Amino acid sequence: MLNGLNAQNHKTLKVLFLGNSYTYVNNLPQLIKDIALANGDTLLFDSNCPGGHTFNNHFNNATSISKINSQAWDCVVLQAQSQEPSFSPAQVEAQTLPYAIKLDSIIKHNNICAETVFFETWGRKNGDASNCAAYPPICTYIGMQNRLRSSYKLFADTTHSIMSPAGEAWRKSIALNPNLELYSSDQSHPALEGSYLTACVFYETLFHKSVLSNTYTAGLSATNVGFLQQVAHDVLNDSLLVWNIGKYPSCITTDLTEISYQPNVIIYPNPTQKTLHTNTNLPFKIYDILGILCLSGNKSNSINIESLKSGVYFIELSYLNSTKKIRFVKE
């Protein structure tokens, strides 16, 4: 459960948004920042959101790649072109999933502790008329929304990343209060109400705190604000593990003594099959997910892990009076 936290738990996050018009309409990152600020938190963000951009486009966009590598982001939000993830499973697996994987790999290579967050969008109000004949399941809003959910869940599960279920919050809002219009006049892009709901979902997803009773309203009525906050909160908390929130901790650091010159440890590749490399040469221990010691040694720059079974492990690296634990996957 995501609960409201006091002033001693204020957080600062650095987040990069890579998407398109669904992200830049109504300036979604700024809405999230304003909600965070009202709760004493700080969102430092950058974005690259050219209209209609796909994951493939971002992978081949020098600006997007440069921004990923520009600093150690806490989170990078990836939003696909609005229709593409709703296409047939075979088409999504061939056309979209490979670039979700490639972008996630670049993000993790830049900062192994970064979290990739897949921004699940919403179906068009009356389905995708332009692609209905070619793929009838997306002829309706519900059919399109179901495919979006499945695809974004696929992206998140495949890369061991987070899914921010904005589209599921839209689904719940529409079911409970169909008269509250979330769409703009084109029945695709968000009205301010839709962007505010999405921002509430993202605040809870990124900061792991409750949005309930947040005082930032974006100029919306108190009634609508309260309703949208509750919808976002309910959707997040009903299914935290479905959205992979807290399921795949990318980095766990246990500092016995804080040391200003502790090395910035990177492990690669992750996932891996035979060998795990680090950018240090420190004593190491490898534990399985149950905390059982599986391997240990004195030099961590190249570790043979062929003896490990497939699964999730943690490597613990020791440096003076400090230890760092990092999660990795053996395939």
In which residue ranges do the predicted regions lie?
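Bacterial Sec-dependent N-terminal signal peptides
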Residues: M1-H10, L256, F314, K325
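Conserved catalytic region of serine esterases and O-acyltransferases that act on ester linkages
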Residues: K11, L182, H189, E193, ...
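Conserved SGNH/GDSL esterase-like catalytic core that processes O-acyl groups on lipids
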Residues: T12-L16, Y22-I101, I106, I112
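Extracytoplasmic/secreted proteins, especially bacterial periplasmic and envelope-associated proteins
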Residues: F17, N27-D34, T63, Q91, ...
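Structured segments of extracytoplasmic/periplasmic soluble domains
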Residues: S21, V25, L31-N39, Q79, ...
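Conserved beta-strand termini and adjacent loop/short-helix elements that scaffold enzyme active sites
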Residues: D46-P50, F119, A166, E331
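Alpha-helical cap/lid subdomain in secreted, periplasmic
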Residues: K67-S188, L192
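C-terminal outer-membrane/trafficking sorting elements
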Residues: T257-E331
